[in-house]
C-alpha cells in the first residue's frame, strides 16, 4: 500500500475474494442477499462481509495500524438463488479471532449486527453458519443431553411424552398443580409451564414451583416412573432467573425451563452452566423465533438459531411439528433436527444444510414437537422424529372429553402402539390410522380421543421453500 488514501472505495476491492481457500478455523456464513436495484451482487456480498467484520463505509487511517488480511471477513463465493430474480447466496468466511470464546452473544452481535440495516441491501437473511471445531470446543453446550437425560429418567427406546398446561394464564397455583398432577398420573413423562407463565399476580412463581413439585412427586410415587414438570425460570433479570433455578434445585425437581430468545443468550448460557453443575435438565422454548425466522428473504433461519442454542446450552428445544398448527417443512425441519441431535452432519442443500457441521464432543439436544398435535398424528410423529424426541400434546391431552388423565392415557397408548408397530417392521406412514384404530379397541380413552379429533388437520401452503 502506498500510504493512506482517504475516500470511499468499493467494498469488493477489499472484501470480495473469490480465490480465497477457506480455513478449518473460519466461521462460514451463507447469506441470502437481495441487493438494491443497480448494486452488483459482488458489491453486495462484499458489503456484508465488510460491515459484519472489520470494514466501515469509508477508508480510515487506523486501518494502517492493523492487519486487514488477518482480520477481515471475506465474501468468497456468490451464487444466484434459483427461481428468484436478483437474489443471491453470498458465502462469507470470518477469521476465528474476531469472536470471543464461548459467547453466542458476541458471535451474533458481529455476524447479524448492524449489517442487517444496511442501505445497499433490500433484504438479508442468514441461512446457515458453519461453526468450526476450534470454536465449538469453547462452549459447554447442553447441560446433559440425550443419553444422560435417558439415564436420569430411566426411559429408553421411545419418544418422551409431554403436556403443556392450559389455560396458559389465569389458573391459581393450586389449581395449576392439580392439572399438573393429572397428566403424569395418566402416563405422560413431563408437563410444561407455558412460556408466558413467569410470575404474574394470579400465580407467583414460588407458589407454582411448590404445587408443581408436589404434583409430580405424587404422580411419581403412584406410577413408579420418573416424572418432571418444566418449571419456567425465565425472569426479568438474570439474578431473578437464577433465584428460581436455585429454588427448583432445592425442591429436587429434575428439570427447569427457559425462553432463550426473549431471555437472551447471555442469560441462557449462565442458566445452562448452572444446570450442568447442579444436575438439572434444561428445557428451551423458542418464543419470538418466528419474528426472526419466518420471512423468507430477511432475518435468520431457524437452523441458525438451533445451532446457537446447542452452543449456548439446552437439553430440549421446540422445533416445529411438520404436522400440527405451526409452520415447518418436512425436509428442512428434519435438517435442523439432525443438526440438534447428531454429532456430524453432512452438507445437504436439499435439506437446507449449506455446510458440513462437526459438533465434536458437544452433547445433542432433543427436538420437541409441540403445537396442535393429537393422537391421530402419533404415527406420523413417531415416523418423522424417531425415538430421540419429545412429543408435546397440550390441547391434545387436556382437551380429551373425559379430561386430562384419560387424555394422557390415550396419548401414551397411541405412542406405545406406534413404537411397537414400528419395531415389528410395520410401515407407520401407510398403516398409521389402522395401528391407532387397533389400539383403541383395547383403550376406551384412546377410542374417545379418536372420536373427537378424527379429521382435524391444519393444512396450509408451506412458506419456507429452498
Curated annotation (Swiss-Prot):
CDD domains assigned: RuBisCO_large_I (cd08212)
Location of N6,N6,N6-trimethyllysine modifications: 5
SUPFAM superfamilies tied to this protein: RuBisCo, C-terminal domain, RuBisCO, large subunit, small (N-terminal) domain
Record-linked InterPro entries: RuBisCO, RuBisCO_lsu_C, RuBisCO_lsu_C_sf, RuBisCO_lsu_fd_N, RuBisCO_lsu_N_sf, RuBisCO_lsuI
Active site per database record: 166, 285
Cofactor: Mg(2+)
Gene Ontology biological-process entries: photorespiration; reductive pentose-phosphate cycle
Catalyzed reactions: 2 (2R)-3-phosphoglycerate + 2 H(+) = D-ribulose 1,5-bisphosphate + CO2 + H2O; D-ribulose 1,5-bisphosphate + O2 = 2-phosphoglycolate + (2R)-3-phosphoglycerate + 2 H(+)
Signal peptide: none
Pfam families: RuBisCO_large, RuBisCO_large_N
Residues at which Mg(2+) binds: 192, 194-195
Keyword annotations from UniProtKB, A to Z: Calvin cycle, Carbon dioxide fixation, Chloroplast, Lyase, Magnesium, Metal-binding, Methylation, Monooxygenase, Oxidoreductase, Photorespiration, Photosynthesis, Plastid
Enzyme class (EC, first level): lyase
Listed GO MF terms: magnesium ion binding; monooxygenase activity; ribulose-bisphosphate carboxylase activity
Residues annotated to bind substrate: 114, 164, 168, 286, 318, 370
Any one GO CC term of the record: chloroplast
Known EC number: 4.1.1.39
Recorded family membership: Belongs to the RuBisCO large chain family. Type I subfamily.
Role according to the record: RuBisCO catalyzes two reactions: the carboxylation of D-ribulose 1,5-bisphosphate, the primary event in carbon dioxide fixation, as well as the oxidative fragmentation of the pentose substrate in the photorespiration process. Both reactions occur simultaneously and in competition at the same active site.
HAMAP family: RuBisCO_L_type1
Further comment found in the protein's record: The basic functional RuBisCO is composed of a large chain homodimer in a 'head-to-tail' conformation. In form I RuBisCO this homodimer is arranged in a barrel-like tetramer with the small subunits forming a tetrameric 'cap' on each end of the 'barrel'.
Record-given protein name: Ribulose bisphosphate carboxylase large chain
Species this protein is from: Cornus kousa
Taxonomic lineage: Eukaryota, Viridiplantae, Streptophyta, Embryophyta, Tracheophyta
Amino acid at each position: 500500500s502506498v500510504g493512506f488514501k482517504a475516500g470511499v472505495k468499493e467494498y469488493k476491492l477489499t472484501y470480495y475474494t473469490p480465490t480465497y481457500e477457506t480455513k478449518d478455523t473460519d466461521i462460514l456464513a451463507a447469506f441470502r442477499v437481495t441487493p438494491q436495484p443497480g448494486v452488483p451482487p459482488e458489491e453486495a456480498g462484499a458489503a456484508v462481509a465488510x460491515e459484519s467484520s472489520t470494514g466501515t463505509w469509508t477508508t480510515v487511517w487506523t486501518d494502517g495500524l492493523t492487519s486487514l488480511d488477518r482480520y477481515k471477513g471475506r465474501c468468497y463465493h456468490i451464487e444466484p438463488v434459483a427461481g428468484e430474480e436478483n437474489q443471491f447466496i453470498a458465502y462469507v468466511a470470518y477469521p476465528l479471532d474476531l469472536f470471543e470464546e464461548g459467547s453466542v452473544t458476541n458471535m451474533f452481535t458481529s455476524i447479524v449486527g448492524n449489517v442487517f440495516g444496511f442501505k445497499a441491501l433490500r433484504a438479508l437473511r442468514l441461512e446457515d453458519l458453519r461453526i468450526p471445531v476450534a470454536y465449538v470446543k469453547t462452549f459447554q453446550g447442553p447441560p446433559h443431553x440425550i443419553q444422560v437425560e435417558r439415564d436420569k429418567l430411566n426411559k429408553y427406546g421411545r419418544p418422551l411424552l409431554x403436556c403443556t398446561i392450559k389455560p396458559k394464564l389465569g389458573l391459581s397455583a393450586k389449581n395449576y398443580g392439580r392439572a399438573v398432577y393429572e397428566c403424569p398420573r395418566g402416563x405422560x413423562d413431563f408437563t410444561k409451564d407455558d412460556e408466558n407463565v413467569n410470575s404474574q399476580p394470579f400465580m407467583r412463581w414460588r407458589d407454582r414451583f411448590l404445587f408443581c413439585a408436589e404434583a409430580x412427586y405424587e404422580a411419581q410415587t403412584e406410577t413408579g416412573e420418573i416424572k418432571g414438570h418444566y418449571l419456567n425460570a425465565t425472569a426479568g433479570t438474570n439474578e431473578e432467573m437464577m433465584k428460581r433455578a436455585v429454588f427448583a434445585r432445592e425442591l429436587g425437581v429434575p428439570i427447569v425451563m427457559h425462553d432463550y430468545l426473549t431471555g437472551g443468550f447471555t442469560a441462557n448460557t449462565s442458566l445452562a452452566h448452572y444446570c450442568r453443575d447442579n444436575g438439572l435438565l434444561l428445557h428451551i422454548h423458542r418464543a419470538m423465533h418466528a419474528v426472526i425466522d419466518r420471512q423468507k428473504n430477511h432475518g435468520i433461519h431457524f437452523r441458525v438459531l438451533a445451532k446457537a442454542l446447542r452452543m449456548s446450552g439446552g437439553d430440549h428445544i421446540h422445533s416445529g411439528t411438520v404436522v400440527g398448527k405451526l409452520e415447518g417443512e418436512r425436509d428442512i425441519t428434519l435438517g435442523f433436527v439432525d443438526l440438534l441431535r447428531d454429532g456430524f452432519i453432512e452438507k445437504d442443500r436439499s435439506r437446507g444444510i449449506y455446510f458440513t457441521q462437526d459438533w465434536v464432543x458437544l452433547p445433542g439436544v432433543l427436538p420437541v414437537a409441540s403445537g396442535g398435535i393429537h393422537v391421530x398424528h402419533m404415527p406420523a410423529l413417531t415416523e418423522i422424529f424417531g425415538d430421540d424426541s419429545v412429543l408435546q400434546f397440550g390441547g391434545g391431552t387436556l382437551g380429551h372429553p373425559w379430561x386430562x388423565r384419560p387424555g394422557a392415557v390415550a396419548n401414551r397408548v397411541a405412542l406405545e402402539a406406534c413404537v411397537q408397530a414400528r419395531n415389528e417392521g410395520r410401515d407407520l406412514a401407510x398403516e398409521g390410522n389402522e395401528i391407532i384404530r387397533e389400539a383403541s379397541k383395547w383403550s376406551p380413552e384412546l377410542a374417545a380421543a379418536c372420536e373427537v379429533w378424527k379429521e382435524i388437520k391444519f393444512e396450509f401452503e408451506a412458506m419456507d421453500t429452498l
